[in-house]
């Protein structure tokens, strides 16, 4: 409690606005980093390995795989489970469903990033405002002094001016850097989701894309033989 009062004295009128910006930055970064950790627990290789052990023409295997993926927390698993749950629909309808789902995920990934960027812009301005207010207080102290001007007369005003500037920059740097890094992560994750869902959609049609960009097509006769 004493440290909070000390910070209020050091930051002056800009203390609570800077406290609020700092708290919002910490909460948004923590929530976004938690989302990042959830998405880092699975790769496309795990999805492909599971699909290789399943026939796209076997409804029972598809239902089991859908249930298995739906029980997982990573967003990539949930996206594949959503697509597998619509395996009985035409390819175009599955693409529409995947497009809607991807839009929702993009909105979720980018939520809070604009607010982080806004905090990164506002915080230095709040610090600058605190600097101006601190200088005003300093000049008031100088004007009220009848004798010689000593460093003690200037200390309070200059202290508020410097502290608010430093606090604003300390909040702005992680806010802006975090917003930019999380935006890059969101774009990379969305590209990964789109690629995986396209792969699964082709797999449901009996086509498999290999690492060398070649396609393997499973004909209905081959699928029937495999199921038997």
Curated annotation (Swiss-Prot):
It comes from the Bacteria. InterPro entries: ExbB/TolQ_transport, MotA_ExbB_proton_chnl. It is a multi-pass membrane protein. Pfam families: MotA_ExbB (PF01618). GO terms for biological process: protein import. The keyword Transferase does not apply. The chain crosses the membrane at residues 11-31, 116-136, 158-178. Signal peptide: none annotated. Disulfide bonds: none annotated. One of its GO terms (cellular component) is plasma membrane. Belongs to the ExbB/TolQ family. Involved in the TonB-dependent energy-dependent transport of various receptor-bound substrates. Protects ExbD from proteolytic degradation and functionally stabilizes TonB. The accessory proteins ExbB and ExbD seem to form a complex with TonB. This is Biopolymer transport protein exbB1. The gene is exbB1.
